[in-house]
């Protein structure tokens, strides 16, 4: 849940930061769309990888990648070196990580519960993702408004660290 929360906050923050940096709706569009092509291109491959390798390891590698991205963006913001190009490139890489994490995340549910509990587990996972998708951008928007983009990326990184710790258990 914390990883999905971090992703949702990041999507909001990345778009708002793109606007703040450029004042261009085209730039915001490029930042937002950058996530989609790798998701489309690599998700099928991510499913194959998920079938052949340990899903927990795939998820953790993706989480480490996202932590690296959010840390890089936070440092770039605090050092005033952030550019719109960073956001576009990072959006692409985040989409790539998620193209591998999502199939592994879906597959791992079946590994964690008995077959007779699978429908409930999938439903609970979907409900958790929906709730997180609703609440996280509100939290992220408030943090961005009151504390700025740098602290928002610190929050995102914190969410991702919680996720990798949770996945390690």
Task: Report the location of each language-model feature.
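Alpha-helical transmembrane-bundle signature of multi-pass membrane transport and export proteins
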Residues: 1-169
């Amino acid at each position: 849940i914390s990883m999905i929360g971090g992703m949702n906050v990041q999507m909001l923050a990345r778009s708002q930061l793109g606007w703040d940096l450029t004042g261009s709706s085209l730039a915001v569009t490029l930042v937002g769309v950058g996530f989609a092509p790798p998701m489309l291109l690599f998700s099928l491959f991510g499913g194959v990888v998920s079938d052949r390798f340990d899903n927990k390891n795939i998820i953790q590698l993706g989480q480490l990648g996202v932590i690296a991205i959010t840390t890089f963006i936070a440092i770039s913001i605090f050092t005033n070196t952030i550019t719109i190009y960073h956001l576009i490139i990072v959006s692409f890489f985040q989409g790539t990580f998620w193209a591998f994490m999502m199939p592994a995340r879906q597959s791992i549910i079946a590994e964690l519960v008995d077959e007779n509990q699978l429908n409930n587990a999938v439903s609970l996972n979907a409900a958790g993702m929906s709730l997180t998708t609703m609440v996280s951008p509100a939290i992220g928007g408030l943090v961005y408004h009151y504390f700025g983009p740098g602290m928002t990326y610190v929050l995102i990184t914190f969410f991702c660290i919680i996720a990798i710790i949770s996945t390690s258990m």
